[in-house]
């Protein structure tokens, strides 16, 4: 008699994706982040659902409803901080996941990679809308500044901004629609994740060496389920350390002041995970140029398969490309630091140099270095 997990219409799907899935025998801990992102998404949806039960998307009561959640709702404080810091963990895992894809050449799975980039944009949109909901000072001014960037689009820019705001400034209509979008987008992310996995399972996973692994596959369960559980425990440990010891470490103190349209904070900045893109935006003196650079800083990932000139897929045996990759990581950390600094003398020029370096490494240095290494193989 055939095993029920292999014959039942629903269990068969789960079995083929999580139990009997043939996986390469040599994938490292860098392959853990996919499952960690799934855990983060489920955690965010669950905590967000409970927060939405008590939150009111209205300019007069939004700030006090968040205070009410933290003070009066049973375990409301832990749900709120798990949701806020869970977003940070989500982005840490996302950046690691994308970095792994770049390092090991996973972008050669075109459909999986392109859906992944769409997922990244969707998660960033969701996280941006979340920033507006507590209706603190940084919520209001962050939303005003970032949405106002769309006015740089020729002809339709101003109309587009007013259409998104639902008026002539960020107000009740903006808050209500951002709450609605913030609620629905995670479910769209979940659907896109299913498509992402569907395309991945068409080709099978990549591996650190970047070579076909069809001749040496092992079942996903128990080998990688155990490995993923270990990763999940470490993720939850770090998250709970953040939540229980330093819940406001990654937030902005200005958001503990209710939104006031008449008082602008001295330094308007987004959440830490957007600072690298914000630094690229600020490094260009022209508004439209800045917006284009901001979009391109993420959209550039779509072009990675076209920029791949190496005969080898992975960077494992390409030392020069490895050096460039880690310089790129250092550059992104520099941009993140600059994004949080005021716009004054040393930071402006550092930001501009780091922005030039970012695009130079990806568009010029990496493809050229890969081509040079191809010639070195002939020696």
UniProtKB/Swiss-Prot annotation:
| Residues that hold heme b b562 according to the record | 83, 182
Topology relative to the membrane, per the entry? Multi-pass membrane protein
What this protein needs as a cofactor is: heme b
Q: Which SUPFAM superfamilies match?
A: a domain/subunit of cytochrome bc1 complex (Ubiquinol-cytochrome c reductase), Transmembrane di-heme cytochromes
| Swiss-Prot/TrEMBL GO biological process terms | mitochondrial electron transport, ubiquinol to cytochrome c
Residues the record lists as binding a ubiquinone: 201
| InterPro entries (UniProt xref) | Cyt_b/b6_C, Cyt_b/b6_C_sf, Cyt_b/b6_N, Cytb/b6-like_sf, Cytochrome_b, Cytochrome_b_C_euk/bac, Cytochrome_b_N_euk/bac, Di-haem_cyt_TM
Q: Which residues cross the membrane?
A: 33-53, 77-98, 113-133, 178-198, 226-246, 288-308, 320-340, 347-367
Location, primary (coarse class): mitochondrion
Key words of the record: Electron transport, Heme, Iron, Membrane, Metal-binding, Mitochondrion, Mitochondrion inner membrane, Respiratory chain, Transmembrane, Transmembrane helix, Transport, Ubiquinone
One short Pfam name that applies is Cytochrom_B_C
Query: Where is the protein situated, by its record's location annotation?
Result: Mitochondrion inner membrane
User: Which terms does the record give in the GO molecular function aspect?
Assistant: metal ion binding; ubiquinol-cytochrome-c reductase activity
The reply on keyword Transport is: yes
Please indicate if the UniProt record lists Phosphoprotein as a keyword: no
Show the GO cellular component annotation of the record.
Answer: mitochondrial inner membrane; respiratory chain complex III
Tell me the cofactor note.
Answer: Binds 2 heme b groups non-covalently.
Q: Which residues bind heme b b566?
A: 97, 196
Sequence similarity: Belongs to the cytochrome b family.
Something else the entry says is: Heme 1 (or BL or b562) is low-potential and absorbs at about 562 nm, and heme 2 (or BH or b566) is high-potential and absorbs at about 566 nm.
Q: What does this protein do?
A: Component of the ubiquinol-cytochrome c reductase complex (complex III or cytochrome b-c1 complex) that is part of the mitochondrial respiratory chain. The b-c1 complex mediates electron transfer from ubiquinol to cytochrome c. Contributes to the generation of a proton gradient across the mitochondrial membrane that is then used for ATP synthesis.
Assembly, per entry: The cytochrome bc1 complex contains 11 subunits: 3 respiratory subunits (MT-CYB, CYC1 and UQCRFS1), 2 core proteins (UQCRC1 and UQCRC2) and 6 low-molecular weight proteins (UQCRH/QCR6, UQCRB/QCR7, UQCRQ/QCR8, UQCR10/QCR9, UQCR11/QCR10 and a cleavage product of UQCRFS1). This cytochrome bc1 complex then forms a dimer.
Q: What is this protein called?
A: Cytochrome b
């Amino acid at each position: 008699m055939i095993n029920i997990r292999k014959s039942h219409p629903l269990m068969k799907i789960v079995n083929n994706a999580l139990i009997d899935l043939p996986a390469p025998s040599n994938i490292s801990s860098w392959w853990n982040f996919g499952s960690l992102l799934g855990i983060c998404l489920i955690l965010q949806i669950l905590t967000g659902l409970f927060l939405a039960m008590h939150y009111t998307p209205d300019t007069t009561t939004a700030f006090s409803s968040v205070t009410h959640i933290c003070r009066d709702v049973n375990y409301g404080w832990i749900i709120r901080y798990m949701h806020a810091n869970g977003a940070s963990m989500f982005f840490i895992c996302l950046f690691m996941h994308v970095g792994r894809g770049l390092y090991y050449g996973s972008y050669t799975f075109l459909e999986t990679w392109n859906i992944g980039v769409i997922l990244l944009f969707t998660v960033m949109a969701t996280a941006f809308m979340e920033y507006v909901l507590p209706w603190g000072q940084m919520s209001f001014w962050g939303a005003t500044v970032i949405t106002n960037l769309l006015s740089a689009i020729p002809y339709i820019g101003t109309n587009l901004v007013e259409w998104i705001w639902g008026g002539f400034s960020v107000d009740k209509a903006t808050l209500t629609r951002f709450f609605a979008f913030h609620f629905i987008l995670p479910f769209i992310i979940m659907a896109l994740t299913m498509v992402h996995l569907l395309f991945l399972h068409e080709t099978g996973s990549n591996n650190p060496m970047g070579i076909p692994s069809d001749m040496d596959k092992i079942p996903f369960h128990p080998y990688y389920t155990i490995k993923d559980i270990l990763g999940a425990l470490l993720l939850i440990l770090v998250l709970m350390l953040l939540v229980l010891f330093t819940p406001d470490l990654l937030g902005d103190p200005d958001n503990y002041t209710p939104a006031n349209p008449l008082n602008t904070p001295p330094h308007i900045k987004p959440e830490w995970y957007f600072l690298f893109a914000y630094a690229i935006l600020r490094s260009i003196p022209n508004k439209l140029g800045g917006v284009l650079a901001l979009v391109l800083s993420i959209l550039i990932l779509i072009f990675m398969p076209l920029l791949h000139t190496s005969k080898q897929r992975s960077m494992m045996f390409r030392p020069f490309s490895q050096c460039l990759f880690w310089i790129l990581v250092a550059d992104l950390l520099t941009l993140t630091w600059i994004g949080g600094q005021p716009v004054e003398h040393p930071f402006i020029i550092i930001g501009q140099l780091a922005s030039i370096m970012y695009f130079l490494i990806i568009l010029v240095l990496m493809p050229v270095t890969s081509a040079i290494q191809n010639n070195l193989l002939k020696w």
